[in-house]
Each structure stands twice: as structure tokens, then as C-alpha cells.
């Protein structure tokens, strides 16, 4: 028993001594946690350098865009071919991707050798050889009669400008075929395939083996957004935000970046951790000074590193009693498979002895222990370096997503990772230590990167088909110049129709006289009350105007109008308004005051004078009973009487559009048009009295409230009316009415978007084909969400957050489509508004007999003010359709309430002038 203990002690002491000896000798190969964190930081900096346009040309880590923009979503199906060229043999596959939802893949494959004379010979011969092998495979599998898409896995650094193209930057590993560098490998292979007249194959995608690995794993796990290969060579790819990729135009969505991390350190960034053995290995390689990171990591080099170390130790008398065999002097005699065998847990020492004996050496027990530890240090350093670079990628992903914890999957492949008994465990452990804020799953790519190339091709086919479907829907909202000119002409005709006495009663564009006959001239003065009713909020204002200084001071208070009041009785609505006025007067210390009042009433009214307005019909969600056909000024007066607390002199009832024009007209006498683009949509303008047949008198001008929201109610714009507009119209409070407003105003745009999203989801193009309860809910898409989603400053991640707030769980690709839909709907709205406005400015130019008209438009409304693109598109449309009109757009900063007070002040001024005359 004692002897056994003695032997165990002796062996353990021997092992300890040998390990210490090797540790001392290879001190520089052992990397501390601090060193790994430093390498991680350096790699982050190299990634940034590679992504930036200015620094990419000199970057060692090239960060190549792959033009792979989406990962599989499970809806892919069909038959695809795949080629994998990049190692000691290449593979051809036929991949059958199952019908939707089943995520099942069937594969048939065949390996072909890549002889040295082919991979180091002439480039044309290489591609002809590959094409011959593909033809052989198709003949064997009876595929010659089929037209099939093909994905090419090409495991060498390529610069791509599209998915189906790749210019070889440099050969790596053992490949050295002449005349291929700086040429498009897809074109070269396509040309070689043309020699086979009976083969009909389209190369749809060129991918790196790393990208193929990521796509293979992503088919099984949608969280997979990183691919890593640790085999003959080493590389990594990951999904980067487009907004960070300077080399590719556009900032929507994500794209897979092939890091080509094997070249990390080629610019000297890793000199402090490279050892004499790394330098010696590099000098003896096919590409000295290149792929320095790869030479410290990959399977092509680990065995050689071990050989160089053993040779040096033997020369120093630290191994084999100082004896060296000719095999130990021979390059390539120790391979990575030997390193893996020597590190096996139980039989490792026995394997070590056997391998060393095969090398012509006579190892002692101590030698075997030492050699095994050399292998451990070399392979552990490899895993550590890989872990540091991968941790940098994971940190970048987490920061891109702006999350505290990242959940992600890394697709893994490569012979070193697969065959080495300790490698995966070591890599995983170090990664988790370096990035504790990331929950990482490592998924082995069972089918290799070739299946991934087929998956990229399948995704490309799916995306192509889906893109066509989405484009068909969006095309309905893309108006041509001819269509806009047609809308302009029809609006012009409807304006004329509404002005004529004979046709006025039947006109859909009402062209209502407002009896506002003058603009402010700067002499107005006094205190005025103004009411502003037109949306879910109601404002009461006290406006103080000072003569001669164009100075206005305003005090206002906003009151809510509950839905039950909006849709209750007329008496309840006006009693609520008077209650709000009483509260305001009390608040301002004006209880019992008698002041002139202007009433901004943003609904279509027929007026017989400036202080009389008969409601034609409610819009914007109001439905109060017993109001339509009644004079709203009388209804307000009666409500004031019922309260019997104060008396007000109601001087003017005006539309919000007129109020907007007057507010801007106070600042700019050239302002003769008012436009509201908000909850509703409307326009007013100063018309020559001679053209207004419903009002007597031919001198001067009068403001006409067009009520253009009703344009199209007679079917004149049915050619641009879509099925989605019909859905929105039928679900509205006033079906068949206000059709132009329903295509252009903030109240309806979000609802049009929702209808499109439902349709696209039904077609399986969005939200994984699942229509959530939230998406079925009318009104969830408020215009403010459209404005936020379309903001240029908003990254897709924030768009996804907005959609999540709306209860819609979207992918990155979904977010892009939602943004496109919002853009198409709001663009059409702005263009239609622009076409309508162009009709009015052209009419004013022609009426005045001018070659060129200069005019100002006063504008208000949340859509115009808050939407990031609406105002620009509207202005561009007006410029294009009315080139002889110089139109200035002036934002009404104080809303239509100030305008009502100004109209009241102007009316008072004109009344006073009449009295004096």
C-alpha cells in the first residue's frame, strides 16, 4: 500500500515539475485576464476602423459587408444547390427546404478532392474543375433538367457590392491559384459553367463559410446572429446595424459582416503578445506577415507551433535528453489532430508517447507529461484569443441593441473546435468570464457551412418573393407626376364648381364664403376673447392687441372635451363650452366682463354673415345631436343665456383654417392662404368677390373656406383610392364622406397603415404571419407614432421599441417594412395636399393675370409641424406642379385661436369705419 502511495506521489511530483518547467519556458504564451480584456478592447477598435469608410482601406480587420440582410424565419421552402470551396476537399449539395413552418431540411451531398495542382495552378482551370464536378453531381442526382438556384460558400476574403458577387482580395490557407485575385469569382464560375450547355444554374449568393455557419444555425435558432469557424482557418461574422456600416449606402436594417479576423495584428497591433515561435512559423509560411491572428489560433498552424516549441526545448536539453530526430526537424510533421489526441483526458499520455515514438524520439514519462502540457498551453492560448475577439463582437451587439443583458446564440464550426476534446469548454468558459452581461448559447453547425449557403440562397429567394409582394402593395400609394397633375386639375374644376351659384349646392368642395373681407393692417387694438373648438381639446384665450406695433399678448387655457360630450347632445356640448368660458374668466379675474368674442369653429359651416354659421356636418369624430343645420353662434348665445352669468359680444365665427391665415397675415400681408394639415385637413384663401356667385357684390376679396376634405366624395379620385382607404372609410363615423381628408389627414393615416399591416401579415410578410389582438384594434396607430417611426434620427431598434409599445413583437426586417409602409402613406398624403394647394395658387395666378405669383401660405396642424418629411414633400409637390408660383410657407406659431381674435379685431375695425362713413 505504501509503495502505491509512493508511486502516486512520485508521479504527481514529476507532473508538477514538468508543468512548471514548461510554464517557465512558455511564459509569454500564457495570457492573463487583464491581457485578454486588453486584446478585446484592441479588437473593438479594429472593428470600428474596418467599418468606417475613411479608415477601412488601412484597416487590418477588413469588416467586409456580405449583403446578407436577413436570417431564416422558417417560411423558406424549395430546392437549392450549394457548393463549398475552401478546404482540402470541396462539397456539392442538393438541399430541399421543407414547406412552411416545418423547419425541415433534407440534404444529399458529394465530396470532391481539390488536388494541389488545381488549387495552386491556373485560376481558369480551378473554376472549370469546380464546374465539371457540379455537372457530375447534377448528372448523378438526375438534376440536369431542372433550373436551380445555387449558393456558393467561398472561404476566402472577398469584397462584395451585392450578394451574388465577390472580388477575391487574397487567397489564404493553401490556395494559390493564379489570376483570380481582384476578379469576381461568381463571374468566373458562371463562365466555367456555361461550357455545360445542359446545366441551368443561377448563382444567387456568394457567402463566406463563417456566414454559412451562422445561417445554418439560425435556421434552428432565430437568436443566432454570430458565426465562428475555428478549423483549418479561423474567422467570425455577425449581424451589424446598417447605420454603422459606412461602406454600404442606407441605414435601414442589419447586414452580416464578415470580419476576416484572421488578419487581426497584421498592422502590428499584437506584436507584444507574439512569441519567437509565432515569428518563426510566420517566416516559414506561404504568406509571411499576413493572417497573424489566424496563425496563433487555427488548426493549420497549431501542430507546427507545437513542433517548433518541442524542437527548441530539445535543443536546450529540456526534452528527450537533448536528442532530436529528423522528423522533429521536418515542417508539418506534427498536425493539429496530433495535438488533439495528446490532450485527450484519459488516453492523452499514451497517445503522446505513441506520437513521439512515430517521430523517431524516445520519450521518458517526464517528456510525455511536458509535451502534453506544451499542447495544452498552445491550444489554450488559441481558445483565449478567440474568446477575446468573440467577446468584443458580443459586446458590440449588446451595445447596438442598447440592452443591459444580451441573449444570443453563436453558431460554431471548424475541425479544431469539433475534434479537440477540451477546446469548446475552454472557449465557452473564457467568453462567459469576459462578457458576464451576455447570455451566450453555443450551437454546433451539424451540417457545415454548405447548408448555410443554401439557406442564404433560400432566404434570398424568400426575400425576393416577399419584396415583390410588398412592392405591389406600396405601389398603390406611389403617385406618378401624371396622377398628381390629374388631381390638381380635378381640384381646380371642383373649386370652380363650388364657386358657381348653379352648381354650388351639389359641389363636394363646398367653397363656403366666410364674410372675412380684410386682413389685419396693424391698426387693430383692444382685448378680445377667442374660443377654439376643433379637436379633442378646446381652448379659451384672452388676446390683447396693441395698435401700430403688431404686438399680441395671449393668455389661454386648454380644456378637454370628453367623448361622451363630443357624441352626446348639442345642448350638452355648448353647455360644456360655456362652463369652460366661465372657468377661464374666473381664472383670469374677468368674471362678469363683456368682451368681443371670436369663435374658431373647425367644422364646415354655411355662413350668411361673419357672425352666423350654420353647421353643415360634423367631422373629426364629433357626433353631437341636434346641431347639423343649426346656427352654432345662436346655440352658443343660448347656452350663455342659460348660464346667465356673463354676456359676450360674439362678433365672428371662423374656421380654424381662416384663423391660421389671419394669424400669419398679421405678420406677413402677403399671406392670402391658410392650410391646416393636422387631425383634419382643410384650406382657405382670399378669392376675388367677382368670382363668388353666392354673395352679392363684385368689389374686393373675401376669404373662402374650401372645405376641401370632401373632394372626391363624388368619385372623381376613385382611380387613386385603394382597398385600404375603403376599409378605413367603412369603419369611420361618416362612411362615404370626407374622402380626400381620409387620405391626407392625421386622424386617418395611422388607420390606413394598420389596414396595410394587417393585409401584409395575412400574406405572411410581417410579424411571422400572426395577427395580434393589438393589431386588430382600431386606432392604435396614432399619427405621432408615424412621425416617430419615420424620423431619420431613429434607429430600427427604437422603431422596434415603438412597435413593442403598441403590442407588436417585430423583427428587424418587420421594422423596416413598417417604416416603409408609414413612409408610403404619409408621402401620398403630402403629395395629395400639395396637388390641392397647387390648384389654388395656380388659380390665383391666373385670376390676377400674372406671369409669376408671389404668395404666402399660413400653415398649422400637427401633421405638418411634427412629421419629419410631410412639410418638405408638400412643398416639393407645389413647386413641381405650380412652377410659376413662388410660394412661401409660414408656420402659424400661435394656432388658430389668435386668428379668431384678429378676425374679431378686423371686423370691429371695419364696423367702426362704416359707422364713421
From Swiss-Prot:
<dbReference type="GO" id="GO:0006006">
    <property type="term" value="P:glucose metabolic process"/>
</dbReference>
<feature type="binding site">
    <location>
        <begin position="208"/>
        <end position="209"/>
    </location>
    <ligand>
        <name>D-glucose 1</name>
    </ligand>
</feature>
<dbReference type="GO" id="GO:0031966">
    <property type="term" value="C:mitochondrial membrane"/>
</dbReference>
<feature type="binding site">
    <location>
        <begin position="862"/>
        <end position="866"/>
    </location>
    <ligand>
        <name>ATP 2</name>
    </ligand>
</feature>
<comment type="similarity">
    <text>Belongs to the hexokinase family.</text>
</comment>
<feature type="binding site">
    <location>
        <position position="155"/>
    </location>
    <ligand>
        <name>D-glucose 1</name>
    </ligand>
</feature>
<dbReference type="InterPro" id="IPR019807">
    <property type="entry name" value="Hexokinase_BS"/>
</dbReference>
<protein>
    <recommendedName>
        <fullName>Hexokinase HKDC1</fullName>
        <ecNumber>2.7.1.1</ecNumber>
    </recommendedName>
</protein>
<feature type="binding site">
    <location>
        <position position="449"/>
    </location>
    <ligand>
        <name>D-glucose 6-phosphate 1</name>
    </ligand>
</feature>
<keyword id="KW-0418">Kinase</keyword>
<feature type="domain" description="Hexokinase 2">
    <location>
        <begin position="464"/>
        <end position="905"/>
    </location>
</feature>
<feature type="binding site">
    <location>
        <begin position="602"/>
        <end position="603"/>
    </location>
    <ligand>
        <name>D-glucose 2</name>
    </ligand>
</feature>
<keyword id="KW-0496">Mitochondrion</keyword>
<dbReference type="InterPro" id="IPR043129">
    <property type="entry name" value="ATPase_NBD"/>
</dbReference>
<feature type="region of interest" description="Hexokinase small subdomain 2">
    <location>
        <begin position="521"/>
        <end position="654"/>
    </location>
</feature>
<dbReference type="GO" id="GO:0005739">
    <property type="term" value="C:mitochondrion"/>
</dbReference>
<feature type="domain" description="Hexokinase 1">
    <location>
        <begin position="16"/>
        <end position="458"/>
    </location>
</feature>
<dbReference type="GO" id="GO:0001678">
    <property type="term" value="P:intracellular glucose homeostasis"/>
</dbReference>
<dbReference type="GO" id="GO:0008865">
    <property type="term" value="F:fructokinase activity"/>
</dbReference>
<dbReference type="InterPro" id="IPR022673">
    <property type="entry name" value="Hexokinase_C"/>
</dbReference>
<dbReference type="InterPro" id="IPR022672">
    <property type="entry name" value="Hexokinase_N"/>
</dbReference>
<feature type="binding site">
    <location>
        <position position="260"/>
    </location>
    <ligand>
        <name>D-glucose 1</name>
    </ligand>
</feature>
<keyword id="KW-0472">Membrane</keyword>
<feature type="binding site">
    <location>
        <begin position="783"/>
        <end position="787"/>
    </location>
    <ligand>
        <name>ATP 2</name>
    </ligand>
</feature>
<feature type="region of interest" description="Mitochondrial-binding peptide (MBP)">
    <location>
        <begin position="1"/>
        <end position="20"/>
    </location>
</feature>
<feature type="binding site">
    <location>
        <begin position="746"/>
        <end position="747"/>
    </location>
    <ligand>
        <name>ATP 2</name>
    </ligand>
</feature>
<feature type="region of interest" description="Hexokinase small subdomain 1">
    <location>
        <begin position="73"/>
        <end position="207"/>
    </location>
</feature>
<feature type="binding site">
    <location>
        <position position="235"/>
    </location>
    <ligand>
        <name>D-glucose 1</name>
    </ligand>
</feature>
<feature type="binding site">
    <location>
        <begin position="84"/>
        <end position="89"/>
    </location>
    <ligand>
        <name>ATP 1</name>
    </ligand>
</feature>
<comment type="function">
    <text>Catalyzes the phosphorylation of hexose to hexose 6-phosphate, although at very low level compared to other hexokinases. Has low glucose phosphorylating activity compared to other hexokinases. Involved in glucose homeostasis and hepatic lipid accumulation. Required to maintain whole-body glucose homeostasis during pregnancy; however additional evidences are required to confirm this role.</text>
</comment>
<comment type="pathway">
    <text>Carbohydrate metabolism; hexose metabolism.</text>
</comment>
<feature type="binding site">
    <location>
        <begin position="291"/>
        <end position="294"/>
    </location>
    <ligand>
        <name>D-glucose 1</name>
    </ligand>
</feature>
<keyword id="KW-0808">Transferase</keyword>
<feature type="binding site">
    <location>
        <begin position="619"/>
        <end position="620"/>
    </location>
    <ligand>
        <name>D-glucose 2</name>
    </ligand>
</feature>
<dbReference type="GO" id="GO:0051156">
    <property type="term" value="P:glucose 6-phosphate metabolic process"/>
</dbReference>
<comment type="pathway">
    <text>Carbohydrate degradation; glycolysis; D-glyceraldehyde 3-phosphate and glycerone phosphate from D-glucose: step 1/4.</text>
</comment>
<dbReference type="GO" id="GO:0006096">
    <property type="term" value="P:glycolytic process"/>
</dbReference>
<feature type="binding site">
    <location>
        <position position="656"/>
    </location>
    <ligand>
        <name>D-glucose 6-phosphate 2</name>
    </ligand>
</feature>
<feature type="binding site">
    <location>
        <begin position="655"/>
        <end position="656"/>
    </location>
    <ligand>
        <name>D-glucose 2</name>
    </ligand>
</feature>
<dbReference type="Pfam" id="PF03727">
    <property type="entry name" value="Hexokinase_2"/>
</dbReference>
<dbReference type="GO" id="GO:0005524">
    <property type="term" value="F:ATP binding"/>
</dbReference>
<feature type="binding site">
    <location>
        <begin position="860"/>
        <end position="862"/>
    </location>
    <ligand>
        <name>D-glucose 6-phosphate 2</name>
    </ligand>
</feature>
Amino acid at each position: 500500500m505504501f509503495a502505491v502511495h509512493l508511486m502516486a506521489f512520485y508521479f504527481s511530483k514529476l507532473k508538477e515539475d514538468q508543468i512548471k518547467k514548461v510554464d517557465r519556458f512558455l511564459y509569454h504564451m500564457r495570457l492573463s485576464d487583464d491581457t485578454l480584456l486588453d486584446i478585446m478592447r484592441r479588437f473593438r477598435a479594429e472593428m470600428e476602423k474596418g467599418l468606417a469608410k475613411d479608415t477601412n482601406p488601412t484597416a487590418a480587420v477588413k469588416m467586409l459587408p456580405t449583403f446578407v440582410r436577413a436570417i431564416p424565419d422558417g417560411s423558406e421552402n424549395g430546392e437549392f444547390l450549394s457548393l463549398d470551396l475552401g478546404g482540402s476537399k470541396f462539397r456539392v449539395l442538393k438541399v430541399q427546404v421543407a414547406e412552411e413552418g416545418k423547419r425541415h431540411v433534407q440534404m444529399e451531398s458529394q465530396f470532391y478532392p481539390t488536388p494541389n495542382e488545381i488549387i495552386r495552378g491556373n485560376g481558369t482551370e480551378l473554376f472549370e474543375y469546380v464546374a465539371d464536378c457540379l455537372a457530375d453531381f447534377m448528372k448523378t442526382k438526375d438534376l440536369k433538367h431542372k433550373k436551380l438556384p445555387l449558393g456558393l460558400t467561398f472561404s476566402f476574403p472577398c469584397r462584395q457590392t451585392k450578394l451574388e458577387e465577390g472580388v477575391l482580395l487574397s487567397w489564404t490557407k493553401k490556395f494559390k491559384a493564379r489570376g483570380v485575385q481582384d476578379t469576381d469569382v461568381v463571374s468566373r464560375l458562371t463562365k466555367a459553367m456555361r461550357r455545360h450547355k445542359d446545366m441551368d444554374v443561377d448563382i444567387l449568393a456568394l457567402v463566406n463559410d463563417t456566414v454559412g455557419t451562422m445561417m445554418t444555425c439560425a435556421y434552428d435558432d432565430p437568436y443566432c446572429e454570430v458565426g465562428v469557424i475555428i478549423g483549418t482557418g479561423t474567422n467570425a461574422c455577425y449581424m451589424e446595424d446598417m447605420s454603422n456600416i459606412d461602406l454600404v449606402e442606407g441605414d435601414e436594417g442589419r447586414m452580416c459582416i464578415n470580419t476576416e479576423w484572421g488578419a487581426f495584428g497584421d498592422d502590428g497591433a499584437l506584436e507584444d503578445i507574439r512569441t519567437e515561435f509565432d515569428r518563426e512559423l510566420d517566416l516559414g509560411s506561404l504568406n509571411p506577415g499576413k493572417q497573424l491572428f489566424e496563425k496563433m489560433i487555427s488548426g493549420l498552424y497549431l501542430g507546427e507551433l507545437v513542433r517548433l516549441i518541442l524542437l527548441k526545448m530539445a535543443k536546450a536539453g529540456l526534452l528527450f535528453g537533448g536528442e532530436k530526430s529528423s522528423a522533429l526537424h521536418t515542417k508539418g510533421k506534427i498536425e493539429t489532430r496530433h495535438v488533439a489526441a495528446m490532450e485527450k483526458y484519459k488516453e492523452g499520455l499514451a497517445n503522446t508517447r505513441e506520437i513521439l515514438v512515430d517521430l523517431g524520439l524516445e520519450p521518458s514519462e517526464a517528456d510525455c507529461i511536458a509535451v502534453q502540457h506544451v499542447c495544452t498551453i498552445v491550444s489554450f492560448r488559441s481558445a483565449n484569443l478567440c474568446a477575446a475577439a468573440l467577446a468584443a463582437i458580443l459586446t458590440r451587439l449588446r451595445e447596438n441593441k442598447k440592452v443591459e443583458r444580451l441573449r444570443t446564440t453563436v453558431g460554431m464550426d471548424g475541425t479544431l473546435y469539433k475534434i479537440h476534446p477540451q477546446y469548446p469548454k475552454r472557449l465557452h468558459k473564457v467568453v462567459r468570464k469576459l462578457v458576464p452581461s451576455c447570455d451566450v448559447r453555443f450551437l454546433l453547425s451539424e451540417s457545415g457551412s454548405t447548408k448555410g449557403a443554401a439557406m442564404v440562397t433560400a432566404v434570398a429567394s424568400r426575400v425576393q418573393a416577399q419584396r415583390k409582394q410588398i412592392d405591389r402593395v406600396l405601389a398603390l400609394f406611389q403617385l406618378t407626376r401624371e396622377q398628381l397633375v390629374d388631381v390638381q386639375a380635378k381640384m381646380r374644376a371642383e373649386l370652380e364648381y363650388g364657386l358657381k351659384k348653379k352648381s354650388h349646392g351639389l359641389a363636394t368642395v363646398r367653397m363656403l364664403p366666410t364674410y372675412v373681407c380684410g386682413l389685419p393692417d396693424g391698426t387693430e387694438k383692444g382685448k378680445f376673447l377667442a374660443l377654439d373648438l376643433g379637436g379633442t381639446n378646446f381652448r379659451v384665450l384672452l388676446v390683447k392687441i396693441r395698435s401700430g406695433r403688431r404686438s399680441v399678448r395671449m393668455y389661454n387655457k386648454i380644456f378637454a372635451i370628453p367623448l361622451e360630450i363630443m357624441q352626446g347632445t348639442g345642448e350638452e356640448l355648448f353647455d360644456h363650452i360655456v362652463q369652460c368660458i366661465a372657468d377661464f374668466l374666473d381664472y383670469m379675474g374677468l368674471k362678469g366682463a363683456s368682451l368681443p368674442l371670436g369663435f374658431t369653429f373647425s367644422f364646415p359651416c354655411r355662413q350668411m354673415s361673419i357672425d352666423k354659421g350654420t353647421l353643415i356636418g360634423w367631422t373629426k369624430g364629433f357626433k353631437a345631436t341636434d346641431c347639423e343645420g343649426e346656427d352654432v353662434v345662436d346655440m352658443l348665445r343660448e347656452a350663455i343665456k342659460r348660464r346667465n352669468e356673463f354676456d359676450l359680444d360674439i362678433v365672428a365665427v371662423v374656421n380654424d383654417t381662416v384663423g391660421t391665415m389671419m394669424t400669419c397675415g398679421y405678420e406677413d400681408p402677403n399671406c392670402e392662404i391658410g392650410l391646416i394639415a393636422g387631425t383634419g385637413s382643410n384650406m382657405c384663401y382670399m378669392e376675388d368677390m367677382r368670382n363668388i356667385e353666392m354673395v352679392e357684390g363684385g368689389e374686393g376679396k373675401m376669404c373662402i373656406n374650401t372645405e376641401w376634405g370632401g373632394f372626391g366624395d363624388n368619385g372623381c379620385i376613385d382611380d387613386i383610392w385603394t382597398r385600404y382607404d375603403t376599409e378605413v372609410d367603412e369603419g369611420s363615423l361618416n362612411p362615404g364622406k370626407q374622402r380626400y381628408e381620409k387620405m391626407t389627414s392625421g386622424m386617418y393615416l395611422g388607420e390606413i397603415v394598420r389596414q396595410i399591416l394587417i393585409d401584409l401579415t395575412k400574406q405572411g410578410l410581417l410579424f411571422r404571419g400572426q395577427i395580434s389582438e393589438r393589431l386588430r384594434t382600431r386606432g392604435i396607430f396614432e399619427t405621432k407614432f408615424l412621425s416617430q417611426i419615420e424620423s431619420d434620427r431613429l434607429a430600427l431598434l427604437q422603431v422596434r421599441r415603438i412597435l413593442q409599445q403598441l403590442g407588436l413583437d417585430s423583427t428587424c426586417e418587420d421594422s423596416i417594412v413598417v417604416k416603409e409602409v408609414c413612409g408610403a402613406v404619409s408621402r401620398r398624403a403630402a403629395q395629395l395636399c400639395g396637388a390641392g394647394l397647387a390648384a389654388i395658387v395656380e388659380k390665383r395666378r391666373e385670376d390676377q393675370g400674372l406671369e409669376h405669383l408671389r404668395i404666402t401660405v399660413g400653415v398649422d396642424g400637427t401633421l405638418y409641424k411634427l412629421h419629419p418629411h410631410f412639410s418638405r414633400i408638400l412643398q416639393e409637390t407645389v413647386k413641381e406642379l405650380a412652377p410659376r408660383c413662388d410660394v412661401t410657407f409660414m408656420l402659424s406659431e400661435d394656432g388658430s385661436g389668435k386668428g379668431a381674435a384678429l378676425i374679431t379685431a378686423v371686423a370691429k375695425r371695419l364696423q367702426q369705419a362704416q359707422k364713421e362713413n
